[in-house]
Amino acid sequence: MAKFIFVTGGVVSGLGKGITASSIGALLKASGLKVFMQKFDPYLNVDPGTMSPYQHGEVFVTKDGGETDLDLGHYERFIDEELTKLSSTTSGKIYLSVIKGERKGDTSGKTIQVVPHITDAIKNKVYQAAKQSQADVIISEIGGTVGDIESQPFIEAIRQIRLEQGKENVMFVHVVLLLWLAASKEYKTKPIQNSVKAMASLGIQPDVIVCRSDSSSPKDIKEKISLFCNVPITNIIDAIDQDSIYRVPLALAKQNLQDIIIEQLQLKANAIDLTSWKQFNKKIDSSSQEIEISFVGKYIELQDAYLSVLESLKIAGWEFNKKIKIRWIQAETLNESNYNEILKNSQGILVPGGFGKRGIEGMMLASRYARDNDIPYLGICLGMQIATISIARDLLNWTDADSTEFNKNTTHPIFDYIKGIDRDNIGGTLRLGTMVTKLEKDSLVSKLYNSDVALERHRHRYEFNNKYKKDLESVGLRFSGIYEEKNLVEVIEMPSLKFFVASQFHPEFTSRPNKPTPLFKGFIKAIIENNK
């Protein structure tokens, strides 16, 4: 039978509940336990797929095509497991399923209420995750902050799960902010006390309190929190600011958080083995020389919009003992008169995914600069599309070459809507999830993957128009990755250049500590070799 850990947050949002939950998962996995993780978001969107990156940040795609919260990227990277749609649930998804059931007559004419119908649906998601994953431990993060009106059904649901399963099977971890007042030079615990009281008023007593701060809390402060919050002092854990999120598991392990959990939940675990985490942290420590990458995107004002791309770059850099320095370039600012000057010191150029017309002309100029100057280039999703269109415009002189996403009247639609995709609804209608890409023999990408196939995740609704394949091949473009089932182009490269590679899929979703995705590893290696 699975055990359950629920991670909640108090005082303020944005404390790093996701990193805390991920670190707990990493510690339990390092103790020989099978872990499954999930996130409950209180917002009423069915999923984040239609939300603006400026509102939500990155949409992380699971192997089965779930469009999910960016915290799932942290979960997968920390526990090195592929999660599923079951790992992401929103209030919108819960309410929609309950209302659909009522409309179909599944509720036998009963009055539909938050308790029990909504709370039962939430509990079913937790129990379903336990049944399908067959994990030893299910770790569920509750989004938002205790006291938020939107979170109350989730808090009530996990209270009921504790009642149903017992304290030896359910654990509550509460992440809070420990305030430091610089003026009076003292810590203030009252916000923590009030947060725990708010939890208690909803029927939940935290078993562990994780205190976020920029330094370790003194013993007397821990004693005070312990006394007023009714939590043993051994279960008051410091989570201080780190220069890398990948140091957090080791920091929590030093405070024996895994032992506290294993003891309360009566888990049969092995002695913890943190060898891989220690080795990874040594790579971080030994990385000194910087590599500067020009990151040409359209959502750069909110870096969380590209979270997995950034983490993938860091992980690949550390593999070569290099630090990654990002030079953020808003694609809209690039034009014919300034792009050479702005991009002239680029060691590598990356154009990530995105939707819509804004900024694409600047992205094409970045792609052109990489081609003309033989600078390592990596394009992802939209970054592949604009690279291909740019080649059609510059090398075939098709000046109006475009995607029908940007220009429905183009006479050279290099990219067009995927056949069979719903054109009327944008939610959940993209090509999503892991697909098998067949890699051409002796291509650069096949050498990077050391395989004739790549398993990567997708999120797009436009595809390359095979009508123009021979024309583009005639000017040196190689179509080196194909989804054979539907003959869709997945990877392009320019063999005449040192590293000019772009993929329709998103390789950033499969990067892991100590295991960088081949495209990112190859990109960083090419930059290093190009700058010797």
Swiss-Prot record:
GO molecular function, one term: glutaminase activity
EC category: ligase
UniProt: L-glutamine binding residues: 54, 354, 382-385, 405, 461
Record: active site: 381 (nucleophile), 506, 508
Residue span, Glutamine amidotransferase type-1 domain: 292-532
Residues reported to bind ATP: 14-19, 71
Enzyme Commission identifier(s): 6.3.4.2
Keyword line: ATP-binding, Glutamine amidotransferase, Ligase, Magnesium, Metal-binding, Nucleotide-binding, Pyrimidine biosynthesis
Binding site for CTP: 13, 148-150, 188-193, 224
Superkingdom of the organism of origin: Bacteria
Further remarks about this protein from its record: CTPSs have evolved a hybrid strategy for distinguishing between UTP and CTP. The overlapping regions of the product feedback inhibitory and substrate sites recognize a common feature in both compounds, the triphosphate moiety. To differentiate isosteric substrate and product pyrimidine rings, an additional pocket far from the expected kinase/ligase catalytic site, specifically recognizes the cytosine and ribose portions of the product inhibitor.
Subunit structure: Homotetramer.
Record-given protein name: CTP synthase
The organism of origin for this protein: Mycoplasma capricolum subsp. capricolum (strain California kid / ATCC 27343 / NCTC 10154)
Gene: pyrG
